[in-house]
Amino acid sequence: MKSAYDDSAALHLPDRIRNDALAFRNTVEAYLRNEMTEKEFHSHHVGMGIYEHREKGRFMVRVRIGAGIVLSGQLIRIAELSHQYGSGILHVTTRQDIQIHGVTAPHLADVVERLLEVGLASRGGGGNTVRNITACFGAGLCTDELFDVSPYAVAVAEYLLQNERSFMLPRKFKIAFSGCEKDCALASVADTGFFARIQDGKHGFTVYAGGGLGVNPRVGICIEEFVPAENVFAVAEAVRRLFDKYGNRANRNRARLRYVLADAGEEAFRELYRQEREILREQGLPGEIPAIRKKIPHVPNGRAIPVPLVLGHITADALTVVAETALRFGTGEVRTTQLQDLLIPNIPEEVVPRVLGLLSDAGLGKGANGHPKIVACTGASTCRLGICRSRDLAQAIGDHFHACGIVVDNASSPVVRISGCPNSCAAHQIAEVGLQGSGRRINGILVPHYTVYVGGSLSGQGARLGEKVATVPARRIPELLADCLANGKIDPVKLRMRAPHYEEPPADLPETYWRDFGSENAFTLPGRAHSTAPAEHERASK
């Protein structure tokens, strides 16, 4: 069944975003004419959501997917651009973006402009900006939600993106909307997190602020017990202004909103927020207030078909199949998830077998296939900030489990989250099982390690950060996880007890320990992880 194609649910780009995207060609051409230094070009392209790979001259373009809602025609365009200008491999991120990899500098403006033609942009996908505003990937579909939060996430994005100050902040600024206490959108650890609430029959939100992962992580504090839904714009703008005004612009390592909270204290932070709200009440909200648009109509008794991916990777050809399947059998809508997967909503029950068959023919639908479900950042193989090759560790874990004949029940086993450095792009610090890349010296030799986190959780009633229990050589991680199985799943309690026993390397250190997974070269740190927390990157072993 093909439903009416209605793009009202997806993010509508404000004129400012369109103008910035069109102006980017002048920047690229100036760089190619050597009229701009590498450093100057970097300052421009990062704010456009474009990052250079470790391979010099190749770039990643991060496409904003507002609230994780993307339309079939948009996905087809992304796939086309990956084929024509990139590597043909796309990546779904933990914040619901889609990344096009391997683009050369001469084609960056082409990619940005052709995204614009289908209502997509990379602007604000990086740099000191309001980043992609996320929402539960099951918004409007989930039986646990109080109400559909995605229209509010989209509208707040449209509101903030029209303001030039949203691209001139002290550091990145992340907003998330969760529809229930399960907090699938990670709102409790966002700079500003909205939780759906219903009070006296009225839709609204409980609001948290000052959360964040990475170096010195913390859970946000409640700044609004209940605010009517129509006031989301004022709340978001007030917190943005607070950050713009009080964020630490002198010290990048303390420039996130959570440091404003840490320095001020909880009650003083709330008072700063209340002051900004009062100013907005007196002066009125600047800019146009977007409509809270209705979503694409749902199919009665429709199914949401998960498309599990391995580490968020999908080929351009397979992405095209997903897009065409959603348009042919659903409503032309696809979701990106915080678990780096895709979801096709609104598939009529009677065509589900056909849809599953098409996905299977495209090599999709297997996901972890009996291995632990792993969420991983891109890691040091491509990211210039990475310390360890997180994706290669994920592959090694799967290979080890397969070689040992271990089958994991993914429905009950904790998700393993792997970040290649302290920046926590895979959100390892709120995982039941989390791993963070680092480097330590053993007998004078620099060896890749992972710090093991256990016991993290998300909740609208109070998230809990994971506890560091050990720092283990990278080569021992697959064996450690396999040793912590119970009833077909990784047991965090066992992991807490056994991880310290894996810290010690063999007495006669094998040369493989000197190399990270996926690399033939000795492990090094120069040029890596130069963003935050250098003190954690290299430590002498005891």
Indicate where each model-derived feature is located.
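Peripheral terminal and linker regions in Fe-S/redox and tRNA-modifying enzymes
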Residues: 1-542
